[in-house]
């Protein structure tokens, strides 16, 4: 048993794993409430409402892709036709960059791999897989992927020079990462 000094409630409950970094906890609720808490007290440091900020609606199962901390940024899947992903300043919650568009959010968490000596933020959306520079959001490569709406859930898995993207209803994708320049080839 552990003492509980505070509790937090969300409409529709959270579906994302909280992200803990230093003395902060970052949560993303099912309806798009992105909140930064002080870990020891539960006091809110900043918050954003992704549904309003990105003029979108929750996917069928709500926001369910946990945020990723990279340096001084918190990277999230945010919406659809306005932006697919965005990075926020860890301390203030201010948007640092936004990138991509998608027919639906999907549920795949952002992940970082290194290929061709370059750090690449890999993002999966219902009709494609793409990578951007995690510091700027600038597109590095993109390949089509018909994942049957937003039903993709698992994070891409890297093995050697290959990147495996698992979908739904047998729609999987194997990519070979170029070792000279950021890019991929469908295998």
List where the protein language model places each region:
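Extracytoplasmic beta-rich repeat domains
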Residues: 1-19, 47-69, 79-82, 96-118, ...
